[in-house]
């Protein structure tokens, strides 16, 4: 489709004329709508969520419940490889007794090594916190969708601080389940945490290595670590010092356990001040804007391209004008409704939209703040209706639904 050849501008209202081809309630508080553009080939699949319905809630999921989760595909990103697809996570969690009605792909990710480009919080658990250097260079991934325990929502930027307290002394750690614990890259940080999510053999023939030239402090809480929930008391169960000798890196399997990998002066100090059986305190704070309220769900996005009702274009013109399939999430000004919508593209039946065009769609949908998740061949939406779960959009990946890294589910409590 050529706007110019058709003497048509994406500034025109008529450019966004559509017809509603499907409109039905999937569950109480969840409405599905399918919009089909009239003047060119474009379909949009939207889910409207009533935020005043306390039975409708959000859940997030990491593929296979592990992180990192390598795909072993050299980032070719074609279809299903090793990691769970969205459909598989929705089906699995329904089988576990969770009434999942809708699912979408969320974060951008490195497919081969299997880590997201932004943070992932599930039921308060810091599943993935990337290191400060990566956070500082991925400036277009600083936003996200945060659903707090009190059911409020934020799209603001985030800031993480992790601390281990030994007596009155505090020691900062910088990441959770980040591949930085391989100790193979620069820059490095002298204390990084990993948990039961960091699995030694995530898939047959693939490993998640951990560098051994470090001090390993293994602790166990009486409950799983959560962000914005204060200090958790932990007991040191084991200390392994691999700085001067060959050791095997420890992996843990209990949800209450964690491993702090420490190097440098911090390791020198901790090895003197800690012994097995000692009590310590550990905390994880994730500030969203100015809020440190307890968090149920956080999924990192790419751009927040509608902010307080105003179009906020990506700074690079070529990014702003690139036409893509996309996955988006936005909220109305009165905060009564969230709309999740997928823009299809890269096929004969769907052109895709650029950021300005997506903004015009948001405006038409009545949205005041909007973020964009991963797009392209990752864009996918799944729904459950009349006993059947299925993908409802047209995935543009030539090999079908893709093994993404993490997903967002909409659940109705029963």
Which residues make up each language-model segment?
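Zymogen propeptides
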Residues: 1-261
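Extracellular structured ligand-interaction cores
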Residues: 44, 142, 277, 326, ...
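Conserved, well-ordered active-site substructure
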Residues: 113-139, 147, 296-368, 373, ...
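Well-ordered beta-sheet/strand-loop patches within structured domains
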Residues: 235, 243, 252-256, 287, ...
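Short alpha-helix capping/helix-loop boundary micro-motifs
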Residues: 259-273
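Loop/turn positions that initiate beta-strands
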Residues: 274-281
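Short, Lys/Arg- and Gly-enriched loop/turn segments at beta-strand edges
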Residues: 285-298
